[in-house]
Amino acid sequence: MTLHLGSHVSMNGKKMLLGSSEEAISYGANTFMVYTGAPQNTRRKPIEELNIEAGRAHMKENGIDHIIVHAPYIINIGNSEKPATFKLGVDFLQSEIERTQALGADQIVLHPGAHVGAGVDKGIEKIIEGLNEVLTENDGVQIALETMAGKGSECGRTFEEIARIINGVTHNDRLSVCFDTCHTHDAGYNIVEDFDGVLNEFDKIIGVERIKVLHINDSKNPRGAAKDRHENIGFGHIGFKALHYIVHHPQLQDIPKILETPYVGEDKKNKKPPYKFEIDMIRNGTFHEGLLEKIVAQ
């Protein structure tokens, strides 16, 4: 079994997908995740400018056969208050799915949505409506609903909420789940001392076979804080031992694991990516106390 381990990488400039693949390889990764453009706006390059052919060739040369796309966080199909926001979310999600397919990825990770004060039931109802508009039966891409921390009015912070969304969608064979360790911890699940119990609960409520992506992040906050602030691997409230256990869990073996941990350094203009060091540490199974200093010194 191959451990598919990588991180979020950038996709910009002239190189686009080729640059993403080169960045991933520089970290010692064999998978990666990208946004197809800035996550906070709808400006996107046309598909023919994503440099897909060169990017795919570089991936193939370096043994990367699986990549993930993350939908931008401006998409909110849980908004029942503003029809324009909902419509933008549906339309933009549809075009992002086309871009995901063009890149050769089969998973696009989506934050389910926020109810913006209308209540969870209303939010879930709207998310189902949006997904039913977007998902037709003939498309190869799955939308991976991300487990959320429960910050603000986020929907999808419990397994039950995600199950309700999945069960409400007609073509729900096109839905999968992205299990985020920081989010589930912050939502109150005890993944530190009882990950097997949490996974069993997930299996009963949703089905473990739905998990197609894992976001591996430590957390700056104690369990149940509903905050969603990622921390570097081993330096937060989840800790290295628990995260290493999750990454190497026999039930999650072939699933891509993606790090979204923060860049390191005091100088805001010159923070350094931690991924090469964290990937190496996870593969070797030994925690390095002095890792952050090492990252800054690179």
Swiss-Prot record:
Do you know which PROSITE patterns this protein is assigned to?
AP_NUCLEASE_F2_1, AP_NUCLEASE_F2_2, AP_NUCLEASE_F2_3, AP_NUCLEASE_F2_4
Instruction: Report if keyword DNA repair is assigned.
Output: yes
Reaction(s) the record says it catalyses: Endonucleolytic cleavage to 5'-phosphooligonucleotide end-products
Residues that hold Zn(2+) 3 according to the record: H183, D228, H230
* Key word DNA damage present: yes
Question: Which cofactors are named for this entry?
Answer: Zn(2+)
Q: Per the UniProt entry, what are the Gene Ontology biological process annotations, in alphabetical order? A: base-excision repair
Q: Where are the transmembrane segments?
A: none
Q: How is the cofactor bound?
A: Binds 3 Zn(2+) ions.
Entry-linked InterPro entries = AP_endonuc_2 (IPR001719), AP_endonuc_F2_Zn_BS (IPR018246), Xyl_isomerase-like_sf (IPR036237), Xyl_isomerase-like_TIM-brl (IPR013022)
Q: Which residues bind Zn(2+) 2?
A: E146, D180, H215, E260
Supply the alphabetized keyword list. Answer: DNA damage, DNA repair, Endonuclease, Hydrolase, Metal-binding, Nuclease, Zinc
Report the GO molecular function annotations. deoxyribonuclease IV (phage-T4-induced) activity; DNA binding; DNA-(apurinic or apyrimidinic site) endonuclease activity; phosphoric diester hydrolase activity; zinc ion binding
Q: Where does Zn(2+) 1 bind?
A: H70, H111, E146
Pfam families per the UniProt record, alphabetical: AP_endonuc_2 (PF01261)
Q: What EC identifiers does the entry list?
A: 3.1.21.2
Q: What Gene3D superfamilies does the annotation carry?
A: Divalent-metal-dependent TIM barrel enzymes (3.20.20.150)
Family named by the database record: Belongs to the AP endonuclease 2 family.
Q: Its biological function?
A: Endonuclease IV plays a role in DNA repair. It cleaves phosphodiester bonds at apurinic or apyrimidinic (AP) sites, generating a 3'-hydroxyl group and a 5'-terminal sugar phosphate.
Name under which the protein is recorded: Probable endonuclease 4
Q: Which organism is it from?
A: Halalkalibacterium halodurans (strain ATCC BAA-125 / DSM 18197 / FERM 7344 / JCM 9153 / C-125) (Bacillus halodurans)
Q: What is the lineage of its organism?
A: Bacteria, Bacillati, Bacillota, Bacilli, Bacillales
